[in-house]
Structure formats: C-alpha cells, structure tokens
Swiss-Prot record:
GO molecular function annotations of the record: NADH dehydrogenase (ubiquinone) activity
Gene Ontology BP, a term: ATP synthesis coupled electron transport
EC main group: translocase
Enzyme Commission number(s): 7.1.1.2
Source organism of the structure: Phataginus tetradactyla (Long-tailed pangolin)
Function of the protein: Core subunit of the mitochondrial membrane respiratory chain NADH dehydrogenase (Complex I) which catalyzes electron transfer from NADH through the respiratory chain, using ubiquinone as an electron acceptor. Part of the enzyme membrane arm which is embedded in the lipid bilayer and involved in proton translocation.
PANTHER family: NADH-UBIQUINONE OXIDOREDUCTASE CHAIN 4L (PTHR11434:SF0), NADH-UBIQUINONE OXIDOREDUCTASE SUBUNIT ND4L (PTHR11434)
Keyword NAD included in the entry's annotation: yes
Protein's UniProt keywords contain Hydrolase: no
Catalytic reaction list: a ubiquinone + NADH + 5 H(+)(in) = a ubiquinol + NAD(+) + 4 H(+)(out)
Protein name as it appears in the record: NADH-ubiquinone oxidoreductase chain 4L
Record keywords: Electron transport, Membrane, Mitochondrion, Mitochondrion inner membrane, NAD, Respiratory chain, Translocase, Transmembrane, Transmembrane helix, Transport, Ubiquinone
Topology relative to the membrane: Multi-pass membrane protein
Disulphide-bonded residues: none
C-alpha cells in the first residue's frame, strides 16, 4: 500500500472521528461529511487510474456530483434551521417539533 493510499485513508478516518466527536453544530458535521466525501473521491479516482478500467472512469465524477448535491442540501437545511430555530445546535433539533 502506497503512502498516498495511507494518507487518503487517514483523512477519511480523521473526518469520521470529527463527525463522531464534534456533533454539536450542524456546520461542523457538514464540514466533516464533506471531508469524508472528498477523501472517498480521491481514493476512487486513484483506484480507477491504477486498474485502468475504462468503464468505471465516470464513477468518481458521479460521486463528486452526489457530494455537491449533498453539500447544497446540507447548506439549505442549515439556513432553514438557523432561520426557524435561531441556532445550529444539533441537540436543539427535535424531529417531532420540526
């Protein structure tokens, strides 16, 4: 396993740990989720380039499109929650009240 693979996996693990530890604000959760998606994109692009599989060459771009859609939806939910509740604390959100 090369040093690049180890660094990308370490970036994913750090983002996952950040997602688990810093859950108090919605913005920090979205940033950690974005870091996870970016490391998945990098790992998938490296894997597709290494195996020279031409049919899977669009897979990293499709993942990047889904990551952009996820970021847009997350930011719109952040704006909606901060406008209605006045804060972005995850603990203040209750599914029965929203």
């Amino acid at each position: 396993m090369s040093l690049v693979h180890i660094n990308v996996m370490l970036a994913f693990i750090i983002s996952l740990i950040g997602m688990l530890m810093y859950r108090s604000h919605l913005m920090s959760s979205l940033l950690c989720l974005e870091g996870m998606m970016l490391s998945l994109f990098t790992m998938m692009a490296i894997t597709v380039l290494n195996i020279n599989f031409t049919l899977a060459s669009m897979t990293p771009i499709i993942l990047l499109v889904f990551a952009a859609c996820e970021a847009a939806l997350g930011l719109s939910l952040l704006v909606l929650v901060s406008n209605t509740h006045g804060t972005d604390y995850v603990q203040n959100l209750n599914l029965l009240q929203c």
